[in-house]
């Protein structure tokens, strides 16, 4: 395992937030790395700050992310209180559909675990 895969997570851009809802996921957002940071890091710290499961949709376009959030097979379930670091394309779009009600999701681009 490369030593760079063991570094602590370092934020490299602004945190975005959205309210995952049901029955329809909101417009997808990007969490870009600061343009002054010379990296193509594609790691994202994702927090589900709610008491319900969120089905995270990720895609290369807003429409793809919304479609992916709409089905269990193409989404990533985030359990209540989840704090994950996941790797995606640096220009990915994110949205989510909640199991019920609304849920706040925070996404921070960066690098590390």
Predicted feature descriptions by range:
Residues 42-44, 86-103:
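Noncatalytic modules at the cell exterior or secretory-pathway interfaces
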Residues 47-70, 106-107:
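Short, surface-exposed beta-strand/strand-loop-strand elements in extracellular ectodomains
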Residues 29-58:
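Short, contiguous, helix-prone interaction/anchoring segments in small proteins
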Residues 3-4, 12-40, 101:
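Surface-exposed ligand/attachment interfaces on beta-rich extracellular proteins
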Residues 10, 19-21, 47-49, 79, ...:
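A structural detector for beta-sheet-dominated domains
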Residues 110-113:
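Low-complexity intrinsically disordered segments
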Residues 75-91:
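Beta-sandwich interaction modules
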Residues 13, 41-43, 81-85:
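Intrinsic-disorder/low-complexity, polar/charged segments enriched in Ser/Thr/Lys/Arg/Asp/Glu/Gln
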């Amino acid at each position: 395992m490369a030593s760079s895969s063991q570094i602590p997570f370092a934020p490299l851009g602004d945190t975005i937030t959205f309210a995952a809802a049901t029955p329809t996921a909101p417009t997808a957002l990007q969490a870009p790395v600061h343009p002054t940071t010379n990296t193509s890091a594609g790691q994202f710290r994702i927090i589900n700050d709610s008491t319900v499961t969120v089905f995270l949709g990720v895609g290369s376009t807003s429409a793809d992310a919304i479609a992916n959030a709409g089905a269990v097979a193409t989404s990533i379930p985030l359990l209540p209180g989840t704090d994950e670091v996941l790797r995606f394309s640096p220009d990915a779009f994110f949205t989510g559909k909640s199991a019920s009600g609304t849920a706040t999701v925070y996404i921070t681009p960066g690098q590390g675990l």
